UniProtKB/Swiss-Prot annotation:
Family: Belongs to the complex I subunit 4L family.
Residue intervals passing through the bilayer: 4-24, 31-51, 67-87
Disulfide pairings: none
A GO BP annotation: ATP synthesis coupled electron transport
Major place of residence: membrane
Protein name: NADH-quinone oxidoreductase subunit K
């Protein structure tokens, strides 16, 4: 059995999610916003692993779903960075406020 209580995992996940949410809502740099979204996804993964390991009937379902979520997050980051590079070639800025128009 684990010596770390479940509340410690959940508290850490809440803190990580709140930091990611704060960064995603307040920062204007697109790269930082993508990193904050990844931080929020990692907090959700921590919850999945904690509940699957420390639940009443421990099984691998949460851990497998967490691996699936990590692969989707990697694809999301790759697509997001590709879009960011394409936008940066047309307009040399990475700020969210200046990327609200499609033509320009």
């Amino acid at each position: 059995m684990s010596s770390v209580p479940a509340s410690a995992y959940l508290t850490l996940a809440i803190i990580l999610f709140c930091i990611g949410l704060f960064g995603a809502l307040t920062k204007r740099n697109t790269v930082i916003v993508l990193v904050c979204i990844e931080l929020m996804l990692n907090a959700a993964n921590l919850n999945l692993v904690a509940f699957s390991k420390l639940g009443l009937f421990p099984n691998l379902t949460g851990q497998i779903f967490s691996l699936f979520t990590m692969s989707v997050a990697a694809a999301e980051a790759a697509v997001g960075l590709a879009i960011l590079i394409a936008l940066y070639r047309n307009r040399p800025t990475v700020h969210v406020d200046e990327m609200d128009t499609l033509k320009g």
